[in-house]
Amino acid sequence: MVLSPADKTNIKSTWDKIGGHAGDYGGEALDRTFQSFPTTKTYFPHFDLSPGSAQVKAHGKKVADALTTAVAHLDDLPGALSALSDLHAYKLRVDPVNFKLLSHCLLVTLACHHPTEFTPAVHASLDKFFTAVSTVLTSKYR
């Protein structure tokens, strides 16, 4: 999926507004994913999966940090996320559908926290971005 110049502007602008809250939003989105799609919990049998747990927050921060890296490398997502793609494909063996579920929950979380900024254009740009990230993360499954 190709991100247009307008998409890139929307993504970077939104990520700048998120600022220091990215880790919190990542944890909240992960909580939302576990609550809405319980099958996603199977990858975290060693975690305390109760809402707001320290382990979920810490992993949510890892997700947010990876997305921050992706935002900084919009023109080379495969290069920026190659190691993460290897990890999820070869070691963790995460079912690719879970990236789509988490992406949806990330969109919902961002919309809840930034309703004014979450215009249809921003929504579409972020959806394309999360789809592009998901595509990269699942590219080594083949």
Curated annotation (Swiss-Prot):
InterPro entries: Globin, Globin-like_sf, Globin/Proto, Hemoglobin_a-typ, Hemoglobin_oxygen_transport, Hemoglobin_pi. Keywords: Acetylation, Heme, Iron, Metal-binding, Oxygen transport, Phosphoprotein, Transport. Residues 2-142 form the Globin domain. GO terms for cellular component: blood microparticle; haptoglobin-hemoglobin complex; hemoglobin complex. The modification N6-acetyllysine is found at K17. O2 binds at H59. GO terms for molecular function: haptoglobin binding; heme binding; iron ion binding; organic acid binding; oxygen binding; oxygen carrier activity; peroxidase activity. Belongs to the globin family. This is Hemoglobin subunit alpha.
